[in-house]
Each structure stands twice: as C-alpha cells, then as structure tokens.
C-alpha cells in the first residue's frame, strides 16, 4: 500500500472488495450492487495514519457532508486523500473536521467531510 504523509493530510491507494460491499448491503437487507454506497467510505478512515491518532479516543460524529460526482465501483483502485481541516477547542470540547476525498485518474469521485467532537475529561 503506497502512501504519503504530511502534517495535516495523507494519500493512500484504496479500493473496496466485492465481499466487503456485499457484506455491507447484507447488513441493511439490500441486494448486492456493484456500486459502493457513499457512507461505506467510513471504513477507510482507520487505514490512514492521520486518523489513527484518534483510534483510542471517544469521538462523537456530529456532522457529515457528501459531495459525490461519480459512482464508486467495486474492485477499483482510487487515490484516497484524508485532510485534517480544522481542530478547534472551546472550553472542554475539541471539534475536529476532516475530509476524505477519492479520485480516479485525477478526477474527483467523492468527498466526505465529517465533524467529530471530543469531550475533555
């Protein structure tokens, strides 16, 4: 797996296997389709070193936004780019905003922007 890491963003080659997509559809009692559901992109976040620093944190997802311009296909390699957009602390809450973008042949496929909060103890 080839990857590039900067302070606030990282790139990885990613793909969705037929088996994982079929299992996802089965969880929702839906028939299998070759199109990957947009929210399945959440399964990619832990693959990025940038996100691993939050692995043992209790993050609460508060907001999601999806901008999809093309279908995501099974068994197709995409370049995934995870970017740490913002980290803001107010009183005892830290708010993190990150964006995951998939491209294929330098063409935008999808961007999933999510905001998480973490309460400080």
Swiss-Prot record:
More details: May contribute to vancomycin resistance.
Source organism superkingdom: Bacteria
Name listed for the protein in its UniProt record: Protein VraC
Gene: vraC
């Amino acid at each position: 797996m080839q990857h590039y890491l900067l302070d606030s963003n990282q790139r990885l080659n990613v793909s969705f296997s037929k088996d994982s997509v079929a299992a996802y559809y089965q969880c929702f009692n839906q028939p299998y389709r070759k199109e990957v559901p947009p929210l399945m992109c959440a399964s990619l976040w832990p693959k990025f070193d940038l996100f691993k620093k939050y692995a043992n944190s209790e993050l609460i997802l508060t907001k999601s936004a999806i901008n999809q311009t093309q279908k995501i296909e099974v068994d197709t390699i995409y370049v995934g780019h995870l970017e740490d957009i913002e980290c803001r602390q107010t009183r005892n809450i830290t708010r993190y905003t990150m964006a995951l973008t998939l491209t294929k042949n330098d063409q935008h496929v999808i961007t999933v922007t999510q905001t998480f909060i973490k309460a400080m103890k």
